[in-house]
């Protein structure tokens, strides 16, 4: 039979280990919009119905060059999951991007992949832990997918596995500085340089 004292010590030890080894929550101020429901996402993207949202996801990627970033509404969708370690470790990076690059026409949105499974399926994002596709970041220009990370291989149709998320490379890949500067209210002379 186990003594009460030994049980209390064991319980206390488990509690101390849980406190010491659990991940701290990221609690800094953030301009990233956390969407919790389909309705919020529809309002944010200015869509009328779920069908419109699924059509948006299935629409062909826009790969044509843009001429004027000042007139483009950019939405960066970050699909995350609480169980994916990579999402936990990269969350401060996405918040940093949101705080630095959010403007009136550039928005950063965080979506829980568990709540938006139909949308994940429509965007061809696997929520399986073995797929290593989370977090997936989609850049929408006027509600049409323009870029995604990790990118999908054109020949196989599968998303690549990402081991390291580097800040500089992601900023260049998504052209975040140019988008931010083009949509900020900084004066007409500087905006002409981005056309």
Question: Which residue stretches match the model-derived regions?
Answer:
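Short active-site neighborhood of thiol/selenol oxidoreductases, capturing the structured segment around
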Residues: 70-85
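Thiol-based oxidoreductase modules, predominantly thioredoxin-like and allied folds used
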Residues: 103-121
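Short coil/turn segments at secondary-structure boundaries
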Residues: 89-92, 121-125, 150-153
């Amino acid at each position: 039979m186990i003594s009460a004292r030994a049980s209390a010590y064991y319980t206390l030890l488990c509690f101390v280990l849980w406190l010491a080894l659990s991940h701290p929550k990221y609690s800094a101020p953030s301009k990233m919009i956390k969407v919790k429901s389909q309705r919020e996402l529809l309002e944010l993207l200015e869509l009328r119905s779920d069908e419109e949202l699924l059509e948006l996801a299935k629409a062909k990627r826009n790969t044509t060059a843009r001429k004027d970033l000042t007139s483009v509404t950019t939405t960066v969708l970050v699909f995350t999951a609480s169980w994916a370690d990579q999402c936990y470790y990269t969350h401060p990076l996405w918040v940093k991007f949101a705080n630095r690059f959010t403007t009136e026409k550039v928005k950063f949105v965080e979506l829980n992949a568990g709540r938006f499974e139909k949308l994940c399926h429509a965007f061809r994002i696997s929520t399986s832990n073995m797929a290593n596709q989370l977090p997936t970041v989609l850049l929408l220009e006027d509600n049409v997918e323009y870029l995604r990370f990790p990118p999908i291989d054109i020949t196989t149709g599968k998303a690549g596995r990402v081991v390291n998320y580097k800040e500089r490379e992601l900023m260049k890949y998504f052209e975040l500085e140019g988008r931010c500067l083009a949509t900020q209210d900084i004066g007409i002379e500087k905006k002409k340089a981005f056309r």
